[in-house]
Curated annotation (Swiss-Prot):
<keyword id="KW-0472">Membrane</keyword>
<keyword id="KW-0067">ATP-binding</keyword>
<comment type="subunit">
    <text>The system is composed of three essential subunits: KdpA, KdpB and KdpC.</text>
</comment>
<dbReference type="Pfam" id="PF02669">
    <property type="entry name" value="KdpC"/>
</dbReference>
<dbReference type="GO" id="GO:0005886">
    <property type="term" value="C:plasma membrane"/>
</dbReference>
<feature type="transmembrane region" description="Helical">
    <location>
        <begin position="7"/>
        <end position="27"/>
    </location>
</feature>
<comment type="similarity">
    <text>Belongs to the KdpC family.</text>
</comment>
<keyword id="KW-0406">Ion transport</keyword>
<protein>
    <recommendedName>
        <fullName>Potassium-transporting ATPase KdpC subunit</fullName>
    </recommendedName>
</protein>
<dbReference type="GO" id="GO:0008556">
    <property type="term" value="F:P-type potassium transmembrane transporter activity"/>
</dbReference>
<keyword id="KW-1003">Cell membrane</keyword>
<dbReference type="GO" id="GO:0005524">
    <property type="term" value="F:ATP binding"/>
</dbReference>
<keyword id="KW-1133">Transmembrane helix</keyword>
<dbReference type="InterPro" id="IPR003820">
    <property type="entry name" value="KdpC"/>
</dbReference>
<keyword id="KW-0630">Potassium</keyword>
<keyword id="KW-0813">Transport</keyword>
<keyword id="KW-0812">Transmembrane</keyword>
Length: 205
């Protein structure tokens, strides 16, 4: 019996060592050497402190900053653990809204969000990504159109020329991956950090 089982046991042990130890360590080591920034989570630092990741969005609400997409993520209610409360961009609980196209709650939220945005920029059409949440609730990017829609509000709040803010958006716009995958996008956290630097120095960066 043991003789018949030995090949299976040897293969099991060998594959466990190869796929569970050697391969993960080799890939981790290669990533640390070839792509250290990405391997560490694409973390963004400022003043020696980690302030976020380029891969996970953050909730910006002040007029002086660009805002990301709506986020449907939640967190446990501190008053009642059996319930949840809205917690935008909660990376511990990635999720979408799960509201279907016929949902009244979704329609009401969309109408409210569109009205709020139109009040900020009445002459422009509201970009769809500014009123729709991503499937993960953690999308760090918005479209260039969504960024430009917010220029009047941001420029007014910071007392900056709109042309300079638009130039900053252009400099921070990333193209399609490999030239054909996805859509052009702007990372909201990186854009806001560049905006802070521009305001501090008086020059676009």
């Amino acid at each position: 019996m043991l003789k018949e089982l030995r090949p299976a046991i040897v293969i099991l042990v060998a594959l466990t060592i190869i796929t569970g130890l050697i391969y993960p360590l080799a890939m981790t080591g290669a990533a640390q050497v070839l792509f250290p920034y990405q391997a560490q989570g694409s973390l963004i630092e400022q003043g020696g402190k980690t302030i976020g990741s380029a891969l996970i969005g953050q909730s910006f609400t002040a007029d002086r900053y660009f805002h990301g997409r709506p986020s449907a993520t939640t967190a446990p209610d501190p008053k009642d653990a059996s319930k949840t409360v809205p917690a935008p961009y909660n990376a511990v609980n990635s999720m979408g809204s799960n509201l279907g196209p016929t949902s009244k709650a979704l329609a009401d939220r969309l109408r409210q969000d569109v009205a709020t945005l139109k009040a900020q920029n009445p002459s422009a059409a509201v970009p769809v990504d500014l009123v729709t949440a991503s499937g993960s609730g953690l999308d760090p990017d918005i479209s260039p159109q969504a960024a430009r829609f917010q220029v009047p509000r941001v420029a007014k709040a910071r007392n900056l020329p709109e042309a300079e803010v638009e130039t900053l958006i252009d400099s921070r716009t990333e193209g399609r991956d490999l030239g054909f995958l996805g859509e052009p996008r702007v990372n909201v956290l990186k854009l806001n950090l560049a905006l802070d630097r521009m305001a501090a120095s008086g020059q676009p960066r």
